[in-house]
From Swiss-Prot:
Lineage, top ranks: Bacteria, Bacillati, Bacillota, Bacilli, Lactobacillales
EC numbers for this chain: 3.1.26.5
Family designation: Belongs to the RnpA family.
Keyword terms, alphabetized: Endonuclease, Hydrolase, Nuclease, RNA-binding, tRNA processing
Pfam families associated with the record: Ribonuclease_P
Protein name: Ribonuclease P protein component
Subunit field text: Consists of a catalytic RNA component (M1 or rnpB) and a protein subunit.
Keyword Cell wall biogenesis/degradation: no
NCBIfam families, A to Z: rnpA
Top-level taxonomic group: Bacteria
Protein task: RNaseP catalyzes the removal of the 5'-leader sequence from pre-tRNA to produce the mature 5'-terminus. It can also cleave other RNA substrates such as 4.5S RNA. The protein component plays an auxiliary but essential role in vivo by binding to the 5'-leader sequence and broadening the substrate specificity of the ribozyme.
GO annotation terms (biological process): tRNA 5'-leader removal
A cellular component annotation (GO) from this entry: ribonuclease P complex
Example GO molecular function: tRNA binding
Amino acid sequence: MRKSYRVKKEQDFQTVFDASQSVANRNFVVYRLDKPGQKHFRVGLSVGKKVGNAVMRNQVKRYIRQSITELKPDLLQPVDFLVIARRGANQLTMAETKQNLIHVFKLAKLLKEEADSASE
């Protein structure tokens, strides 16, 4: 993902935390904030020390980034969202990570087909 697709600044993270609702499953928490004037989605990742050592945390972040890249055509565009990994996320394979993210994105209505069916 290019840098323009990332939420990096602490102030941006706080804005999303404060102004949005969270949705969670066993392994991930997602905060979503609609940004109508924005061209595309932006994502912020947070993987705390409870997930594991630095190698495990970086692996979880790589899996999340790869999953989001594969889901990019299906994601709603003018939105900022944060993905927070929970303790069990380091036990997941790449395929399991993607399935868990799809599940939590459906709950957060971040996927296009979910948003279309919710508006009908």
